């Protein structure tokens, strides 16, 4: 459901687009905020336009002085998804070419060998309960196994909510992932058993948390910095 007030000629189409995403079982919170800004942009800059044409799309493409590369790319990708939806329902729309979106510096990944992976998970399993982080020893082994076994990105797992983890069917619903796309990830039986046991234990500690991996106080997810620090600590255990 679109929670922001809309005023442009695209208002009904935006609402329908969000309803479509919601009908698939995925919230669209961050994208809704971007769509709301797009609606304001259209109402102020192109009040007479009722179609997502090239002129409007390229105007939206322009990078702002205070905008970083990731933020610029995110708002472009949301409107690409919107244009794709419009085309699917029979409405003409200009899709910004993917080649025109911002790209960050190229990153060369390190491929871990078997010994490094074994050492990493030995470290992950070696954490002990801590008075200021009573569930850290439960979270870390499952969090990084989910990344390793299912290919989730750190932010996707970190922000994962309980409602998006199906421990019956063995599925994780990833919402608002890279490119503002949603997907369903299957969980293997051995990892599923681990996640079920973890869920039972973590719910006893943080029964009211919405997050599958709640932070030390149970009031939200862990930070990006925390996941990076714990990653390197796993190698030093």
Spans of features found by a protein language model:
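Conserved catalytic core of the tyrosine transesterase superfamily
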Residues: 1-237
